[in-house]
Amino acid sequence: MGTRIDIIGWGGDGMSIVNAVVGVVARHEDMWSVFRPSSEVSRLNSVVASAGGGGGASCCGADSAVAGPGLVVSVETDRLLRDALALAEATGGAFNPLIGPLVAAWDVKAMRAAYVAGVPLPPAPSERVVEAALRVSAWGLLSRVGERRWAMGTPVESVGGADAPSPRLDLGGIAKGHTADACRDLAVAMGARGVLVSVGTSSVSVFGTRADGSPWRAGLRDPHGGPTSVAGVVELPAGDMASLSTSGDNLGPLGGVRVVCAGSAVGPLAGSVAGSVEDRRARETLRETSAGGGRIFDHHIIDPRTGYPAHAGVRQVSVVASSGVLAEALSTALLVDPSIDVPDVVAHWARETSAPASAKVVGLVRAES
């Protein structure tokens, strides 16, 4: 998944649990990575078919190869895709699994690199480019057209051409949370009496307590401070399962959370350049850079509803929820729209999954004026 994964726990055979967890991570990478052409997500992106036509294909072997449009996916991918659509609807599109064309239009990777280096940001895309990407980023283009069969349509008003963008699925916004939960659940099934799994340090799943009976605790980094600055510490529910997700505008390759465990940490905090000379230069560059008719934007987080960088004045959001998928979607959505009604999203999620659900915002850091 292009990031670090840490596991801390007690009970059961530690080495066997770690080896099994590695297998889960590898399997999820094989299914959902947009960088692997053979993954189910990549294959779905490559299928040019809508619910009304096109050829069928299967990810799951001959037993599931039925004629029809789109792509037949595994049971686990089917569940994650259904979750993605449910959360896109519940958040009014603030979370969007089809944001890929907009990310490409804004060249977010280059934007992040420029931010870290403290150099001028790459040129903003034209209004026409943004509008074209926005049309094919509508989450409603993704649909379940049969048993485990999924297709992506093309908007009627979409402009053709060799360089015209096409819908692009990316489950990265919730896959880490799902993987953290799956690894935790497997560890518990294998005898762990207390376990913490951290995927990228921005997605954390826990069960039980630490070996001394105290609750698991996670430190939330301070996006306005240095690389080891902590804005607060969250105690995760003792004796139960819980998931924590942090989304922010400057999360580095190591994520945004660290585990506070008797003075030690699972990995360094995010934003290794925060507070440095390079970071100050980058902040000045961001303040001086305008886009979209003179609009000043604060970071590289794209609002999938408008097609432009979010300007809600929020730097970082942390959510604790009963599900890693729910926590990730909420932290992402609240970053672009802090007015989202969390109880409504949770209620919608509970109806869709037919399971009790809960979520709570445990940290929200606003941008400095």
Task: For the regions a language model picked out, list residue spans one by one.
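Mature catalytic core of soluble alpha/beta enzymes
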Residues: 1-369
